[in-house]
Each structure stands twice: as structure tokens, then as C-alpha cells.
Amino acid sequence: RGLNPDNPVIRGTAQNPDIYFQTREAVNNYYDALPEIVEEYMGKISKMTGREYHLFNYYGAEDAEDIIIVMGSGADTVRTVVEKLNAEGKKVGVLVVHLYRPFSIKHFMNAIPASVKRIAVLDRTKEPGAFGEPLYLDVRAAFYASDRNPMIIGGRYGLGSKDLVPADVVAVFDNLA
């Protein structure tokens, strides 16, 4: 049960305040490198499976004016509605987030068609007292430094395992118009 060199164990590690800040900041370069590394491996997975994955996958009209940004379980429902609405002649799309943290503004902005005028960001969380939910705030921040200025609204879905149904997605697009 005691410590010995043949069976090393570590528990309850701590860093003293005199170096904690520096060690937390020292990892920034590793986090900054992650989007490119993940994108590279997603490319390898795509070659093996035939399914194309990126940090952000866009589906919909190339000249969409209205898009929904979503991640997680609601993405398939939104994509199904986007396909139906596009078949009816509407110009809509969905941006599916696959790597949320670290948030790559470069990859994010490159994935959104230049024609987009209105964006609904759907989060599957509620942040009481906050200006908005996490994904919504990151999307707003990404456009802040851009010369593009679409209208961006936030919304939420799926709290308490409530299903996101196609009628909900249609209502989001109707609200954007």
C-alpha cells in the first residue's frame, strides 16, 4: 500500500500559486494547434469511411441566406428539414459543429457561405443570467472581428431530453425570415 518505485502512484496533486498561472498559460500553444490536428485526423477518417468530416460541416444551398448553427443531437433533424426546404426552392442551410473547443474562428468563418444574412444558433443548454448560451456567444464573437454582419439570434432546444422535431426547425427558419 505504500509508495515504492516498482508501483508508482500519484494522488491529489496540486500546484502552488507561485507557478499555477504560468503553467496554465504554457499550454496555450497546444490548444491552438488542436484544430489543425483534428482536421487532419478527420481527413484520415473520411478516407477510411467515405463520410466527410470537418470541424464544421455545412449542408444546404450554396447561396443560402438563412442558416442554423447547431451541434449534437439536433443536427440530423435540422439537416433533414434543410434538405426538404431546399427542395421546395428555399435558400437555407445548416452548419454542424463537430469540434467546439477550441473554437477555430478560421475554420468556422470559412464554412459559412458569404451569402448568409440571418443566423439562428441553437444551443442545448440554458445559462441563466448570461447574455446568451455558449455557442451563440462564440458565433457572435467570431463575426465581431469580421467584415460580415449577419443578423444573429440565439435559441435553445432539447432541455430535459425534449425532442427537436421538424416543426420546431421550420419555426426557427420562419422566425429568421
Model-based region annotation:
Residues 1-58:
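Conformationally flexible catalytic loops at phosphate/diphosphate-handling active centers
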Residues 34-53, 70-78, 98-105:
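A general structural motif
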Residues 36, 43-51, 83, 87-90, ...:
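Generic secondary-structure signature for well-ordered alpha-helical cores
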Residues 48-59, 92-93, 149-154, 177:
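Flexible, glycine/charged-enriched surface loops at secondary-structure junctions
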Residues 62-90, 103-110:
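Redox- and metal-dependent alpha/beta enzyme cores, enriched for Fe-S-associated oxidoreductases
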Residues 72, 83, 103-114, 133, ...:
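Short glycine/threonine-rich loop-to-helix capping motif typified by GTGT followed
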Residues 88-118, 122:
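Core nucleotide-handling region used for phosphoryl-transfer chemistry
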Residues 118, 122-177:
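Peripheral docking tails and interdomain loops at the edges
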